[in-house]
């Protein structure tokens, strides 16, 4: 009931997000609202050629990929969804485990009549990406995975004990009340503490995403992404029990964040992993070091399988 009552407010809040300017997607892109199993994803689609799916994480939306999409659109069919409950996608009650969200990605591709895809992911997008790749192994040709771990895999149990990731367990009705109306303050913590240079995340970017996360149910559903980590860990171990991924993977770590540990973790689930560490960057690679990050991605995509 509450979600139905808030639907009009969602439309109003979306206009707040539009008021803050970030790098736009080029005119070659159109948007579609694509129905999946229990959700409707806001998807940007542009270009022609082999498919590339770009998946974002917490603290941003598919908008983070606009600079890369502008480069790839000339050679690829570029598909950029907002994950369920995030950005301009719908806010279903459940389905925030990454196994279910991998199904969202599959349904998007099915709707577009696309079978195979390259995959580029960051943060929580990595977790959805692994769940997709592990369940639909014959649909992924290559994966670029950026600066975040996979629940239940590798050094996960040590990572979740770090005070840096206290937010993994920060959720619940009272926690949501603490953040409500203070979304910008909450998000500033991530941009400031997880970056090598907080000034690289400019005011327009911060205002844009703060407005998106101030939309009704947005923080609630973002917290649900973290709440699903325990189930994600169970699912990931089950995926791994069926064998490692064998297609090529580029694991990108920021030198002030995961660094070489990014590739180390991915090697637990894959056999063909190349490592790239981006200098002078924290977790927010596309904002802090976009040129170096995009150059690394473009270089690996240019390689023939």
Regions found by a protein language model. Give the residues of each.
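A short, glycine- and basic residue-enriched loop/turn
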Residues: 61-62, 127, 282
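Conserved HGGG/HGGXW glycine-rich cap/lid loop of the alpha/beta-hydrolase fold
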Residues: 45-88
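Catalytic histidine-centered segment of alpha/beta-hydrolase-like enzymes
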Residues: 281-289, 294
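Short hydrophobic "strand-cap" motifs at the C-terminus of beta-strands
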Residues: 55, 81, 252-254, 278-281
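Bacterial N-terminal signal peptides that target proteins for export
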Residues: 1-6
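Hydrophobic h-region of N-terminal signal peptides that target proteins for export
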Residues: 11-19
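Flexible "cap/lid" subdomain of the alpha/beta-hydrolase fold that forms the substrate-access gate
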Residues: 20-30, 39-41, 51, 86-120, ...
